[in-house]
């Protein structure tokens, strides 16, 4: 990779950062990220990064969303003031992505605010994965590479999930993702229409499509409280599905999600490691992990060398 690139990380996901740097045959850069006694974030870059191409590995999701975001911003400011040539924020899971529009009176558009903060901090480029709303790329005036976990998910399905399958979109917004996967697997497609009373609470579900005597695969970008996911699973079983799997990019797993999963009819929840979840996975044997470190490291390598990354979206063999 040469000596003009540096991989740094905050505290959000040091394990993933280490895997990425190992995959690139690079030593993880020396940066101390902690807190002062009053709770403010403390950052110290402990080696020269002058004129280097610097990549900050820092998801801005749970459990400490705001701390992770502030670490990213303060690290970027420190790196910029240390005369780095270019700063790329690698944000595998982009926090506040669900706040992408005014869905009620006097509501903020926090996704846009976060984009503004990232640019103001001096970041030149963003690499992320499966944005909850792809239009968030338009919130930025800098390049944003939105990678997809779909190739790795398709590989997992082909290798580990036998039987006649039907790909299920858990809502209308996910139909494009589900259709893409069903086409590549030559599988049927079903859609769940859900009515919400409020966030994270579904009042009713309607299934469009046939799942009888098939293995149902729910595909989505995020599993948060898992209430909707578990309800969808039980409905699919009641409609005749032989098994139900869920394949999700970001395993947020907040609240009592683990308890819900353990008590559900779900066979497996397959998530990537965009968010650290080892402790939660230890409490739920249904959780399986797809490692996306190589996808991110390859995107970094190609970005550093000025190469196209589009082929990363299509390698499903």
Curated annotation (Swiss-Prot):
Q: Which residues bind Mg(2+)?
A: 130, 132, 145
Instruction: Give, as in the UniProt entry, the pathway in which the protein acts.
Output: Metabolic intermediate biosynthesis; 5-phospho-alpha-D-ribose 1-diphosphate biosynthesis; 5-phospho-alpha-D-ribose 1-diphosphate from D-ribose 5-phosphate (route I): step 1/1
Q: Which GO cellular component terms are attached? A: cytoplasm; phagocytic vesicle; ribose phosphate diphosphokinase complex
* SUPFAM superfamilies noted in UniProt: PRTase-like
SMART domains reported in the protein's UniProt record? Pribosyltran_N
GO terms assigned for molecular function: ATP binding; kinase activity; magnesium ion binding; ribose phosphate diphosphokinase activity
The Swiss-Prot or TrEMBL record lists the needed cofactor(s) as: Mg(2+)
**For this protein, what reaction is catalysed?**
D-ribose 5-phosphate + ATP = 5-phospho-alpha-D-ribose 1-diphosphate + AMP + H(+)
Q: E.C. number, please?
A: 2.7.6.1
Please give the Pfam families that the UniProt record associates with this protein: Pribosyl_synth (PF14572), Pribosyltran_N (PF13793)
Which of UniProt's keywords are assigned here? ATP-binding, Kinase, Magnesium, Metal-binding, Nucleotide biosynthesis, Nucleotide-binding, Transferase
The answer to whether the entry has keyword Transferase is yes
Q: Which domain of life is it from?
A: Eukaryota
> Region Binding of phosphoribosylpyrophosphate: start and end of each range?
212-227
Output one GO BP term.
Answer: purine nucleotide biosynthetic process
The family assignment reads: Belongs to the ribose-phosphate pyrophosphokinase family.
Give the matching NCBIfam families: PRK01259.1, ribP_PPkin
What's the protein called, per UniProt? Ribose-phosphate pyrophosphokinase A
According to its UniProt entry, this protein's organism is Dictyostelium discoideum (Social amoeba)
